[in-house]
């Protein structure tokens, strides 16, 4: 199977991020600001310090290729409670695990710092996996990638094989037992107000999936 969720003409992808989401809750203590010395704990300032403890150069705007990142995408708070939401992304499984561990390590740092003053954990970090790199499931069935590549070449389309800096439904399907690489659909500027797709690119995508169907009917496959 294939998903049609790629960008420019020729894109063919069978690697994607390992992904997790984190929700971090910061607890504070509110008192009159005029008499707050040594008493007030401002949860918003602790959240800010937490963000500053994340690697500065490992954000979406500072990374590319196979580089992973932390992405803070939501922050809402008051003195007594602040909730921060971020996503964690990495292609490498070991580095992915290290990133998740770092979230808990930073949380524990602040819990230790405020233990005497607050009396309980001041930072509560919840990290949940979202999806995984499909490469592990697709490579043993690499012929499905080769088939799509052959289809493109027969249509004079230059295959652009590269990692997806995101995820697709194909990642979930791959881990459900249906290896599912991704083929271009022509979209550009995803997740922004300038997102668009040329009709000509969609037409090329249709030609590719028709050619894949034709080749499937006439090709003998050896999964091994």
Model-derived segments and their meaning:
Residues 1-43:
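Fold-level recognition of mixed alpha/beta catalytic cores in primary-metabolism enzymes, strongest
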Residues 44-224:
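Metal-dependent amide/peptide-bond hydrolase catalytic core
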């Amino acid at each position: 199977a294939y998903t049609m969720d790629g960008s420019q003409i020729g894109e063919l992808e069978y690697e994607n991020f390992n992904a997790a989401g984190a929700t971090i809750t910061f607890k504070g203590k509110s008192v009159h600001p005029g008499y707050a010395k040594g008493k007030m704990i401002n949860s918003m300032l602790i959240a800010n310090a937490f963000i500053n403890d994340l690697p500065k150069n490992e954000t979406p705007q500072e990374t590319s290729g196979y580089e992973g990142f932390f992405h803070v995408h939501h922050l809402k708070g008051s003195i007594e409670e602040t909730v921060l939401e971020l996503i964690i992304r990495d292609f490498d499984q070991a580095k992915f695990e290290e990133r998740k561990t770092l979230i808990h390590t930073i949380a524990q740092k602040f819990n230790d710092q405020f233990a005497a003053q607050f009396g309980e954990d001041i930072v509560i970090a919840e990290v949940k996996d979202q999806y995984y790199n499909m490469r592990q499931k697709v490579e043993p069935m690499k012929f499905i990638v080769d088939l799509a590549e052959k289809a493109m070449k027969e249509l004079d389309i230059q295959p652009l094989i590269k990692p997806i800096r995101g995820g697709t439904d194909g990642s979930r399907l791959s881990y459900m037992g249906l290896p599912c690489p991704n083929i271009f659909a022509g979209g550009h500027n995803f997740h922004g107000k300038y997102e668009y797709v040329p009709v000509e690119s969609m037409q090329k995508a249709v030609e590719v999936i028709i050619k894949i169907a034709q080749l499937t009917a006439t090709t003998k496959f050896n999964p091994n």
